[in-house]
Structures are given as C-alpha cells and as structure tokens.
A protein has these predicted regions:
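N-terminal nucleophile
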Residues: 1-196
Length: 196
C-alpha cells in the first residue's frame, strides 16, 4: 500500500453541535504502479550486537562444507564439494569449494579429493591438486600425499580436512581441526564413520 504525499482532512459530526476532526490518508499507486515505503528499514536496523556476537561465535570454527569422492567400477574418479552457503559470508569472497585444485580435484591417474577448512589457506596451497600431484610425480601413497598437502594448510595458519580415494580404492581422510564428520564405504560394503 502506498500513501499519497497529500493527505486530506475531513470533518465529521459525531453528535449534533460537536465537531471532531480526523485525518484520512488517500491511498493511491504512484505512476508506473510501484510503491515506495517511506519507513522501510535497512537490514542493519534489525541486527543487534548480541545477535552478531552469537553468530560470530557459532561460525568461528564452522566450515559448513560437504564433499564426496568416488571410484566407479570402470576406474573413473570423481569429486564434489559444496560450500556452506551464503549466510554470513563477506561480499565478494570466493571460497575454495568451487575452485578446481583447491577444494575439489579428480584425476584418474591419481586420486579424487574433496576438502573443507579455511578456504584462503586451501586456495593458496592448492590442496586438492597438491595431493594428486604428490602421488603422480613423487609416487607418494594417498595417505602420505593427503597428510603432506594438509600440512601446507597448517603452515599457512589454516585448518581443515580432506576426504580422498585413489584409483585402487584406498581411502584417506586426514584432518588437522578439532574434528571432521566423515565416512566411507568400500567395494565389499565395509563402512567407516568418524568424527574425531
């Protein structure tokens, strides 16, 4: 609903001999049919210091990423990583999840990797690619390559973890954070689920 800038005042007779005044606001749509709300508050109006402090505490060590790696019956490797979403993110920030080689990477000659953690450190260390490169060019095992790549994240002041599978079906899930929800299932159906 929109109000006209010019409001009319009307007089009414409530009882004989007594006059009361009431204000009547005319409602109309401005040209083009768009409404302008003079009291629409900016988003900052609704944010309190207490709410922001609680959000900051909750997000401090929360990475909110989900990832998957897979080896199919034909020997193809795949990796997928999804970020924790838009809430609380800085405008213009690019995380590691969508960057191939940082938070996600798959190479049929080596391994598939999905990572979660401090995105800036994962980007600078190209963690997912580094894991595969250590296997291809140095002959490192999956577990050794993943741990070494994660050490580079720590050197940059970051924390996080990886899930990875190589072309032989070996799985590695190292992390240097307090914990990381993770699980795997092998070709025989054996499952592994862990947090710490």
């Amino acid at each position: 609903m929109c109000t006209s800038p010019a409001a009319e005042t009307a007089s009414e007779e409530d009882s004989p001999g007594k006059e009361t005044r009431s204000t009547v606001t005319l409602v109309q749509s401005p040209p083009g049919g768009r409404c302008v709300y003079p009291r629409l508050e900016p988003p900052e109006y609704f944010k309190t210091e207490r709410q922001q402090s609680a959000l900051d505490r909750n997000l401090k060590n929360y990475h909110g990423t989900v990832g998957a790696v897979a080896l199919d019956q034909d020997g193809n490797l795949a990796a997928a990583t999804s970020t924790g979403g838009y809430t609380g993110k800085l405008p213009g920030r690019i995380g590691d999840s969508p960057l191939i080689g940082a938070g996600t990477y798959a190479d049929n000659r080596a391994c598939a990797v999905s990572g979660t953690g401090l995105g800036e450190a994962f980007i600078r260390a190209a963690v997912a690619y580094d894991t595969a490169a250590r296997m291809r060019y140095r002959g490192a095992s999956l577990a050794s390559a993943a741990r070494a790549a994660l050490r580079n994240v720590a050197r940059l002041g970051g924390d996080g973890g990886l899930i990875a599978v190589d072309r032989r079906g070996n799985v590695a899930m190292p992390f240097n954070s307090e914990g990381m929800y993770r699980g795997s299932i092998d070709r025989r159906g054996k499952t592994t689920i862990a947090v710490f």
